[in-house]
């Protein structure tokens, strides 16, 4: 037992793709991304403008929002690019509705892009103009002037306290002698000087030890705030050192007291807090203004990119919405187009899904379904009618198949619009369809006169006999009938041309009728021959006895009696041939040696024309046995050999100085597995060009004394033996006649002699039959 093959495990990614296609994950994801893009874009705009609900936004929040915007932008871009690629592929493949889908997407995208681009341009320009106004010269001057005013105010305080410090130091230096020895007074003087000069604090200290010599009021801030060394060094040089406190709420001055040993005056004055606050704000504004002005270019680019990102995000969301709307609009139209293509291809069972909504597309779908249903029912009716018409056509063709006449339908300009196979055969064309569209007057110029005459005789049939010859073949006599067809308004619609051979082979029924009519005639030759013998017997002795008594005009008398005897003999011969033709018996098929029959026939004719015509034979070796009627075959050979001898004797006289070649008749017998051909050639005057197709008809002859029954009898014999008679021109002059019979002749049909299928009116075979017989020979 063969092992069971392991089951194929589907990869997870294929399972995921199938699940995604089943639940419509792509559509759901696209909808979620579009909604998220709208929300993220609005949130980013609100955060950048510091509007509610964010208020003053944390930079990290803006960064996260911008990152989310970029991620959504990329995902939406991928989805839209994927959908556009599918649209492009569908258009390249020529899918139904793809071109309309592309146009709708282009229109919706343009409607979404145009406002966004316009707003982006105006917003960028507005932002650029706004930034330029922020950093204009007037704003820069105002900011700098505000800082200058604040600085001037503080500088004024510093100058005032400097002057007060110098004045107070000068007063203390003047009282140095008394104050140095009286510390209490020194402290009172310092307090008085501080109060007079509106100083909030003042102390005198020793620069070496740092000990306080005198103070005014509460001077804890001065005592505990360290004095920078550089300021102390400035004061030692005799200059006034200005000191600003760390919290900028007061201004201080340090000056050296020259009359005291290494002693310094350190005073301070409080500054208005609002003034200091304004000054700090002005300084901060100036710093920020400078920083922003230095980053103005990058700021413009950053805000422009952020705006473009948000705008592009919203734009892609709008484009995706347009794609979805266009798809929903085009899908039923594409279904209608595809269904229409299937209807065009012949599938009338196709139907489109009808939408439940009562909109125009739903009405169109229902109308299409009703239309296809009606067309399908009409098609079934037409097919039934066509089947009925086709059956009637086949019946008509079956009925008309026995009609040998050719029939062509022509339009008003004489072009063939309908042609029967028999018409093509009579005109020498293999395919009747090849005649469609050709002008009959150009194809058969002999019919041009009748076609020109027919329009002048509306309602009547124009007919005449014409002879046509094609490529050197035997002339063909046609009986042509032309009638016109009208539209009922006096305008001619076309022609109906019917033509047939004037002397065509009779049908079997016609032949039987003709042979039946000959039965009572078969007894006539006996009644005609009965008086001929007495006439001949009386003329000869009468001439012999009377000639002795006639003394004058004996030559005339002899000529007259010879004429009587000769004409009586000719009449007897004609009666014998007619009797043989009329009494043609049913052949009796027995095995016979054709070589012996040929030798006997040639011997009789060579004996009759000894010294005048040379007869040659070319026979196969050994006996050539075939079932046939030896008497009829001998009669056929005798008739043909006699015709050859008569053709040689009937040659026209040669031109002066020339001689006719010796008369020569050659007969050869050729056999193959199927046929035996007996071919007789002579160098006589040849076959006539006119009426050649009628040579095998009874009573048709070109000789003065011919009866016109010899070839008719031969043709009848060949037909009874299942063979054919061929008449052709011999190369170099003369005629070539062939008798072709099959090796195995089918049994007789049992018809009586009078019902034989051959007979009067049987023409020679067509050229194709002759060629076939010659090829078989």
UniProtKB/Swiss-Prot annotation:
<feature type="domain" description="Histidine kinase">
    <location>
        <begin position="523"/>
        <end position="745"/>
    </location>
</feature>
<comment type="function">
    <text>Member of the two-component regulatory system NtrY/NtrX involved in nitrogen level control. Probably activates NtrX by phosphorylation.</text>
</comment>
<dbReference type="InterPro" id="IPR036890">
    <property type="entry name" value="HATPase_C_sf"/>
</dbReference>
<dbReference type="InterPro" id="IPR004358">
    <property type="entry name" value="Sig_transdc_His_kin-like_C"/>
</dbReference>
<dbReference type="Pfam" id="PF00672">
    <property type="entry name" value="HAMP"/>
</dbReference>
<dbReference type="Pfam" id="PF02518">
    <property type="entry name" value="HATPase_c"/>
</dbReference>
<protein>
    <recommendedName>
        <fullName>Nitrogen regulation protein NtrY homolog</fullName>
        <ecNumber>2.7.13.3</ecNumber>
    </recommendedName>
</protein>
<dbReference type="InterPro" id="IPR050980">
    <property type="entry name" value="2C_sensor_his_kinase"/>
</dbReference>
<keyword id="KW-0808">Transferase</keyword>
<dbReference type="InterPro" id="IPR045671">
    <property type="entry name" value="NtrY-like_N"/>
</dbReference>
<feature type="transmembrane region" description="Helical">
    <location>
        <begin position="202"/>
        <end position="222"/>
    </location>
</feature>
<dbReference type="GO" id="GO:0009399">
    <property type="term" value="P:nitrogen fixation"/>
</dbReference>
<keyword id="KW-0902">Two-component regulatory system</keyword>
<feature type="domain" description="PAS">
    <location>
        <begin position="392"/>
        <end position="465"/>
    </location>
</feature>
<keyword id="KW-0067">ATP-binding</keyword>
<dbReference type="GO" id="GO:0004673">
    <property type="term" value="F:protein histidine kinase activity"/>
</dbReference>
<dbReference type="GO" id="GO:0000160">
    <property type="term" value="P:phosphorelay signal transduction system"/>
</dbReference>
<dbReference type="InterPro" id="IPR017232">
    <property type="entry name" value="NtrY"/>
</dbReference>
<keyword id="KW-0597">Phosphoprotein</keyword>
<feature type="transmembrane region" description="Helical">
    <location>
        <begin position="107"/>
        <end position="127"/>
    </location>
</feature>
<feature type="transmembrane region" description="Helical">
    <location>
        <begin position="29"/>
        <end position="49"/>
    </location>
</feature>
<dbReference type="Pfam" id="PF19312">
    <property type="entry name" value="NtrY_N"/>
</dbReference>
<keyword id="KW-1003">Cell membrane</keyword>
<dbReference type="GO" id="GO:0005886">
    <property type="term" value="C:plasma membrane"/>
</dbReference>
<dbReference type="InterPro" id="IPR003660">
    <property type="entry name" value="HAMP_dom"/>
</dbReference>
<feature type="transmembrane region" description="Helical">
    <location>
        <begin position="61"/>
        <end position="81"/>
    </location>
</feature>
<keyword id="KW-0812">Transmembrane</keyword>
<keyword id="KW-0535">Nitrogen fixation</keyword>
<feature type="transmembrane region" description="Helical">
    <location>
        <begin position="305"/>
        <end position="325"/>
    </location>
</feature>
<keyword id="KW-0547">Nucleotide-binding</keyword>
<keyword id="KW-0472">Membrane</keyword>
<keyword id="KW-0418">Kinase</keyword>
<feature type="domain" description="HAMP">
    <location>
        <begin position="327"/>
        <end position="380"/>
    </location>
</feature>
<keyword id="KW-1133">Transmembrane helix</keyword>
<dbReference type="GO" id="GO:0005524">
    <property type="term" value="F:ATP binding"/>
</dbReference>
<feature type="region of interest" description="Disordered">
    <location>
        <begin position="745"/>
        <end position="777"/>
    </location>
</feature>
<dbReference type="InterPro" id="IPR005467">
    <property type="entry name" value="His_kinase_dom"/>
</dbReference>
């Amino acid at each position: 037992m063969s092992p069971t093959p392991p089951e194929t495990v589907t990869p997870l990614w294929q399972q995921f793709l199938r699940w995604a296609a089943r639940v419509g994950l792509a559509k759901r994801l696209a909808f979620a991304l579009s909604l998220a893009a709208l929300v993220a874009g609005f949130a980013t705009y609100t955060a950048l403008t510091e509007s509610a609900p964010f208020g003053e936004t944390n930079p990290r929040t803006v960064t996260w929002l911008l990152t989310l915007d970029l991620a959504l932008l990329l995902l939406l871009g991928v989805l839209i690019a994927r959908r556009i690629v599918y649209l492009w592929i569908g258009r390249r493949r020529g899918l139904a509705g793809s071109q309309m889908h592309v146009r709708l997407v282009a229109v919706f995208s343009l409607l979404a892009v145009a406002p966004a681009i316009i707003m982006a341009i105006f917003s960028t320009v507005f932002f650029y103009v706004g930034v330029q106004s922020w950093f204009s010269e007037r704003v820069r001057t105002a900011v700098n002037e505000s800082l200058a005013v604040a600085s001037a105010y503080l500088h004024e305080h510093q100058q005032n306290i400097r002057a007060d410090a110098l004045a107070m130091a000068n007063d203390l230096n003047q009282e140095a002698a008394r104050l140095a020895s009286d510390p209490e007074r020194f402290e009172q003087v310092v307090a008085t000087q501080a109060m007079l000069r509106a100083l909030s604090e003042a102390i005198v200290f020793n620069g070496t030890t740092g000990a306080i010599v005198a103070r005014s009021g509460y001077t804890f801030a001065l005592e505990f705030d360290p004095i920078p060394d550089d300021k102390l060094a400035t004061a030692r040089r005799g200059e006034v050192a200005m000191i600003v406190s760390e919290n900028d709420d007061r201004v201080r001055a340090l000056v050296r007291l020259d009359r005291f040993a290494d002693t310094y005056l350190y005073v301070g004055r409080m500054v208005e807090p609002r003034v200091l606050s304004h000054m700090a704000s002005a300084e901060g504004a100036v710093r920020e203004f400078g920083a922003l002005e230095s980053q103005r270019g990058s700021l413009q680019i950053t805000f422009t990119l952020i705006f473009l990102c948000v705008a592009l995000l919203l734009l892609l969301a709008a484009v995706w919405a347009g794609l979805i709307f266009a798809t929903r609009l085009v899908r039923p139209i594409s279904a209608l187009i595809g269904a229409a293509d299937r209807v065009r291809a012949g599938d009338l069972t196709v139907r489109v899904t009808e939408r439940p909504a009562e909109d125009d597309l739903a009405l169109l779908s229902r109308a299409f379904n009703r239309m296809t249903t009606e067309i399908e029912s009409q098609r079934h009716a037409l097919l039934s009618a066509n089947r009925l018409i086709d059956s009637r056509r086949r019946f008509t063709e079956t009925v008309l198949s026995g009609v040998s006449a050719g029939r062509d339908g022509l339009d008003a300009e004489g072009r063939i619009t309908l042609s029967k196979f028999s018409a093509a055969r009579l005109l020498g064309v293999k395919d009747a369809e090849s005649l469609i569209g050709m002008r009959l007057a150009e194809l058969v110029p002999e019919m041009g006169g009748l076609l020109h005459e027919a329009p002048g005789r509306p309602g009547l049939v124009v007919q005449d006999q014409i002879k046509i010859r094609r490529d050197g073949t035997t002339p063909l006599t046609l009986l042509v009938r032309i009638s016109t067809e009208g539209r009922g308004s006096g305008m001619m619609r076309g022609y109906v041309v019917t033509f047939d051979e004037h002397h065509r082979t009779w049908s079997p029924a016609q032949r039987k009728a003709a042979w039946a009519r000959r039965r009572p005639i078969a007894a006539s030759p006996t009644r005609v021959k009965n008086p001929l013998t007495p006439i001949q017997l009386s003329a000869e002795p009468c001439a012999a006895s009377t000639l002795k008594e006639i003394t004058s005009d004996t030559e005339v008398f002899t000529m007259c009696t010879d004429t009587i005897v000769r004409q009586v003999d000719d009449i007897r011969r004609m009666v014998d041939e007619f009797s043989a033709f009329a009494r043609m018996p049913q052949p009796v098929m027995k095995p016979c040696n054709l070589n012996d029959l040929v030798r006997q026939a040639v011997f009789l004719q060579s004996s009759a024309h000894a010294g005048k015509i040379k007869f040659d034979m070319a026979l196969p070796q050994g006996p050539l046995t075939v079932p046939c009627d030896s008497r009829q075959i001998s009669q056929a050979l005798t008739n043909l050999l006699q015709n050859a001898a008569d053709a040689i004797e009937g040659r026209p006289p040669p031109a002066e100085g020339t001689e006719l070649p010796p008369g020569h008749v050659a007969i050869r017998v050729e056999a193959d597995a199927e046929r035996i051909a007996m071919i007789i050639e002579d160098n006589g005057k040849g076959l006539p060009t006119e009426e050649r197709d009628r040579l095998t008809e009874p009573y048709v002859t070109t000789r003065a004394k011919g009866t016109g029954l010899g070839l008719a009898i031969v043709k009848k014999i060949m037909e009874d033996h299942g063979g054919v008679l061929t008449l052709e021109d011999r190369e170099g002059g003369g005629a070539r006649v062939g008798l072709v019979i099959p090796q195995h002749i089918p049994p007789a049909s049992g018809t009586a002699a009078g019902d034989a299928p051959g007979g009067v009116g049987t023409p020679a075979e067509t050229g194709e039959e002759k060629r076939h017989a010659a090829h078989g020979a």
